């Protein structure tokens, strides 16, 4: 019986087991059926990284990766900016940029975040003639006072190493272009991270040529500004860039349209913009060596250019007939030509870069609903229309994302019941903005910038633009290191964390290692561990370059992020050191001393301290000067200046007899004789530099003053003097003669007491001031001069003031009098000048000016009377030649006299002046 019971239980258990198996199978079949009915659909989206600032990450429908290749072409290549503007307006994306020469400059700036509109404005406002000028020197206003005086005399500078003449590699180091590119990159919204050009807003490549190996070099890292500068370094004209063992120059030598480089960036659709210059057709156009070299290169590059263009999916060739690669006067037309050419093909490009969604689900006949746009009134109707008309699920999702109002989109389809739900995620709304990491004033300004977006819907692109505007705002305030460290929307609030940044370190790279490090560091306005401002960089570049011991000064930032996403920034300072043994040559011809030559030879970086040791001499038919000196413009890290010199100076002067008209008296001006002045001695001075505008100096001079009889002489003088001079000088003029801006002030007091060894004890005070201003864009220049001198009655003849002439460091300017025509101990003179360019220019810049002077000079203070004031009027034609200013002038002096109670004008014969070259 027990076994029967066991068999009954076993049968019952088997039935239950089979029943359980059937239930499980039914559940599995049901789930499989449901799974077949519900399908999640995601679009094919782009896989490359979006490097721009975003409010939140967002998807973009899959398309071809677009690479833009910008050719060289000099000024012609500015048409690239017009192409970029058209692409922005048409919504054509750029995923990679490759550039050569000017194309590298345009492409590099665009990749770093400058918009086409900003580049358009830059192209119009930059002084291209100055940036590409072959003659290059330190700006006068950035030189120390004594440097200004020395360089004002020279027309030619030769470099030596020992006694070996150094032949420069090029006509220009292109410092101005280097500087503006450095500053533009430092002010850009996106800067390379880890010196990698892939981390810019758009990955970028600059194509250059290594002059050593003769190979093409594609720059993908390093200094962005230096890469642009290297790619545009035209051989012979601009110095190549030294990197490691390479000499990098214009990429157009080997690849003026480097389409194949786009492949290395993964570009699937390559757009080439051709702006290369055609061959010269007129033999007369090949008039200088570099044009001949350019023609040879152009001939050699014709076939490679065509081969590269065949690799492009689209070629844009603006109509640039009649435009020169070196003429920057028709920039607006160049921009418009590029814009027009790009607009013509923009729609076709937009179609060709599109890719169809793969394995799309046909949703014709499906019941469609949309989730996520319930509160999106501004664009809900448009989205509903897109969905209603859709035949493919992925295509509909892609079209919704193309509106740019959504960050994500997917669909769920029930293939059994023919229903589909589209899930759209709009850009997040925010109703408040919280900014941290900046000052309260800056935070308030940023809040104001985002006021229009509060509570509103916006596109992803608009969100990026507003965030970039915040960084641009910080750049305008000078913050070179500022960035948006984190952006997120949380609890209906837009949180923006800003890192203004501090400089971690400064790395100095010298080409030859001649200058001592403290000399370089004292000129830097930046400090490690402190915030970095753009004006500090600009000031540092100016100061270093103005020292005169560097051919080129370049600065850039390198950023590295730590594990916590905080950034460490290093400022790299690259210095191309100049050979410091220099010979300067100057020439001058005038109506007083005829031909004169100036020679100066000195070491301008003595012992690596930027101090100067050397000598100069000036030789003319009637004058001679020689001087040896040691000069430290700055002692150690201070602005204390020091110099010591030994000198010899001799000048021959005419003695005049001048008679003004009187009743029965004919006016005349006669030379009645000639005498000479000789000075020799030693001098030592200590003072303080007033930055680079001037200095205040105490100077002690022990010297011999001699009056040398020639055909006539005043009372013979030959005395030893020990003179203390306190001098204050400010010089902000942009030129020593014919300045258009700036001022010059010189005040000194001489004291020559007997207890210091002077054979004659005297004192004198002198003041002069010149003010220059311009109106109507520099087409009218005004100049005011004031001079006054007061000396005691014991002042010897050789130390008295002089009056007359149109320009000299020895005689106060007075149009209508000859140079050094009158001498005395009391001087008061004022002068006005108006200058304007001639409508017809005589080969070089030509100006016409009118002059008026009033004042006089007297022997004794008791003689000073207002009625004795002389007046002078004159006209002048001046030409700015390569060897200095050429001046032709005529003037007449007069005074008001009285005869038999009648006031009349007394005149003297007119004076004619001529000079060519700089003043010595």
Where are these regions (language model features)?
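Sec/Tat signal peptide C-region and signal peptidase I cleavage site
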Residues: 32-36
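Patatin-like phospholipase
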Residues: 37-100, 108-432, 498
